[in-house]
Amino acid sequence: ADIAIVKVSPLGGIDAVEKIIEKLDVPVRFSGSLESSVGLGSSLWAANMFAPDQVAGLATGMLLATDLVADPILPILGQISMERRDPEVQACEAASLTREKQALWAERVNRALELVPSRVLASWGVPHVSVKG
């Protein structure tokens, strides 16, 4: 590969990303993963720390129906604030799923996990017996 696209949240956070980057022999580019402003803070921090001029798609949180903060981090003229945002109780309550939606998404995740080979699950540290089915 010519470059590695790094998405902080799916890779396990800043510490995990740092360990991964150390092992790479190609330049990295940071990209978002549909994060709220709370999660975006970690991606922004990591991008600024490891590859400040190599970012793309960090504003995908704008695509979410709601954010976990009252004042979301949004880009302005191609720039984005590094200011940390903490989740707010009212915003989290507004974003919470009904029990029916929780059950729907849990079932979707379980169905998807059933398609993942057990050797891959093992490499993620997921015991085979913990997967439904």
Where are these regions (language model features)?
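Active-site-adjacent beta->alpha loops and helix N-cap segments on the catalytic face
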Residues: 11-25, 39
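Short, well-ordered coil/turn segments that N-cap beta-strands
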Residues: 2, 26, 52-54
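Charged alpha-helix within mobile-element recombinases
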Residues: 25-29, 43
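Flexible C-terminal active-site loop/helix
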Residues: 33-133
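Catalytic beta/alpha-barrel core
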Residues: 1-13, 29-33
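Short low-complexity, flexible loop/linker segments enriched in glycine and/or proline
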Residues: 1, 20-21, 44-46
